[in-house]
Regions:
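Soluble catalytic domains of membrane acyltransferases
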Residues: 79-194
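Dinucleotide-binding Rossmann-like beta1-alpha1 core, especially the glycine-rich loop
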Residues: 7-12, 23-31
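Short, small-residue-biased leader/transition segments that mark boundaries at the very start
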Residues: 1-4
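N-terminal signal-anchor transmembrane helix
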Residues: 28-108
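Hydrophobic alpha-helical segments typical of transmembrane helices
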Residues: 9, 44-47, 125, 152-153
């Protein structure tokens, strides 16, 4: 449809903004999403109560506000992936002790799984392709229902040379990588677990 090129152009223009400007937009987005539109507030509230049954209502509301601030930051940071250099990305999102993986690979291990939580912006880890010697980076992902967003996220996640594996293909593809002795690091978050 003609809306897709407009949407992609909007993302690319916003990605040109410096991070400080994007974080101002994030603060505006926080107000719109949390206070005005109230996007999934009931669901977030239920999840918070279920996850933290011992916390007071005051503490739960504080966590709820923090969640929406993080969500707004996540949106603008992910948009920035469309126009960020590898050097800047690696300054902002880094892996502690990547040499541990290198050491194990030198001992003959070929495939590693990195399980990442939803802390910070794990989309930014796509720039990790150059952090592991002679290894390919694979990201397990769940295709999104909206094709425009799915295509956008796939392109952003693979921009720096990593490869995407659909969740439903994980077992088959990882077994193939292991059989072929491909030096690989597989990244997934808790929702991608098969």
């Amino acid at each position: 449809t003609c809306a897709l090129p407009i949407f992609y152009s909007w993302v690319k223009v916003h990605a040109l903004l410096p991070m400080w400007a994007l974080y101002i937009l994030s603060d505006i987005l926080y107000v719109l999403v949390y206070k005005v539109v109230r996007y999934r507030v009931k669901v977030v509230r239920q999840n918070m109560k279920a996850s933290f049954p011992d916390k007071s209502d005051t503490e739960l509301r504080r966590l709820e506000r923090e969640f929406y601030h993080h969500f707004a930051d996540y949106v603008v940071e992910t948009i920035k992936l469309a126009h960020i250099s590898l050097e800047e990305l690696q300054r902002r999102a880094f892996l502690k002790n990547p040499e541990l993986v290198d050491t194990l690979m030198e001992k003959g291990h070929t495939c590693f799984i990195l399980l990442m939580g939803h802390y910070g912006n794990w989309e930014w880890f796509s720039g990790s392709t150059s952090r592991f010697k002679d290894s390919r980076i694979y990201q397990i992902y769940r295709p999104l229902n909206n094709q425009a967003f799915d295509r956008l996220f796939f392109n952003l996640r693979t921009k720096f040379g990593s490869f995407g594996i659909k969740k439903q293909d994980t077992v088959r593809d990882v077994i193939t990588l292991k059989k072929d002795k491909t030096r690989c690091v597989v990244i997934l978050d808790r929702k991608s677990v098969v």
